Design a protein with these regions (language model features):
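Extracytoplasmic gate region of multi-pass secondary transporters
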Residues: 30-38, 178, 242-283
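Glycine-rich segments within core transmembrane alpha-helices of 12-TM secondary carriers
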Residues: 62, 161-186, 202-208, 286-287
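Symmetry-related core transmembrane helices of the 12-TM Major Facilitator Superfamily/SLC fold
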Residues: 130, 195-214
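Intracellular juxtamembrane helix-capping segments at the cytosolic ends
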Residues: 142-156, 269
């Protein structure tokens, strides 16, 4: 009995490496995403509607593309996919830091605790941030499919629930950590901290890249999977399932509300409570509760299925 129990909680090296880099990636992503609309408005001069629209499209693409990125990842292998993903993410986050610096050196804007626009708003150069954000979307699309795929393939039916609870805990530890550094940077540097934050995110994804390069090896998922045509046909089949589409619409409603933590809440809190307020800490309630309760909930639901009332 004891031996059997020990086998159930034993995971492969690839499992732990994948979960560790997931923590790094989530810290990078949420550190930036909690202030993305502030960044777009205060650093690049977009108004509220423009900033929210760009952030919304960014998020929508990030959640749509994993379906297709996952198919490509199956073809080229998970290790190669993660190397590509973290390279794109590192370049993307670095671009979010470097691009405003270039705009400032061109005399179009001045950054300090506040921002003074000296020509940027009259140019179209603020839209140069779009292809940089596209790098993050493409890199993130691979990560969303590959890390969860690694967890699935590196676990057994007996250890899968525990494996995914560890994965989900890592996601939320990363989210909590990334958002925690936002307030100190804003207090110390003001608007300039919104730029500096991206160097932190780039360093996190670069560390993840190194971890994959040196430590990630697995024979579980090299070159296999479906073609894009098969994926597309499967999507059409899914869309014809009325019950599933109804469930997706219900879940979409939840995510529409949840994502207001990032789309509108930071600006709302700062305008209502002042610049000393901490929208990042308000948003941290979610990952903190998840980290503290995920193991308990996993144990409670162990003998139930997704359809068990």
């Amino acid at each position: 009995m004891t031996t059997k129990k020990q086998e159930k909680i034993k995971f492969s090296k690839a499992f732990w490496v994948a979960n560790t880099v997931e923590l790094f990636e989530r810290a990078a992503y949420y550190g930036v995403f909690i202030v993305i609309t502030l960044y777009l408005s205060r650093i690049l001069g977009f108004n509220d509607i423009q900033a929210a629209s760009i952030a919304g499209i960014f998020s929508a693409c990030l959640y749509l593309l994993p379906t297709f990125a996952g198919a490509l990842a199956d073809k080229i292998g998970f290790r190669n996919s993660m190397l590509l993903a973290f390279t794109l993410l590192t370049c993307g986050y670095l671009g979010l830091a470097v691009y405003p610096t270039w705009l400032q050196s061109a005399g179009l804007v001045e950054y300090s605790t506040t921002t003074t626009f000296t020509g940027l708003l009259e140019s179209n150069l603020q839209y140069g941030i779009i292809p940089i954000m596209a790098l993050i979307v493409c890199g993130g699309a691979f990560i969303k499919s590959v890390i969860s795929g690694t967890v699935a393939k590196e676990t057994t039916p007996e250890t899968r629930a525990k494996g995914f609870s560890i994965f989900y805990a890592m996601v939320n530890i990363g989210a909590f950590s990334g958002k925690t550094i936002v307030k100190p940077l804003r207090e110390a540097l003001g608007n300039e901290g919104l730029i500096t934050l991206n160097y932190f995110s780039a360093s996190m994804t670069f560390l993840a890249l190194l971890a994959i390069w040196f430590f990630y090896k697995s024979a579980q998922h090299s070159g296999e999977g479906k073609t894009f045509g098969q994926i597309w046909n499967a999507l059409i089949k899914v869309c014809s399932n009325g019950r599933l589409i109804t469930l997706i619409i219900i879940i979409t409603g939840f995510w529409m509300v949840q994502h207001q933590l990032y789309a509108t809440m930071p600006k709302y809190v700062l305008r209502l409570a002042g610049e000393g307020a901490s929208p990042s800490w308000y948003a941290n309630v979610n990952p903190l509760v998840v980290v503290l309760t995920v193991n308990l909930v996993t144990q409670m639901m162990r003998k139930r299925t997704a359809l068990t009332p």
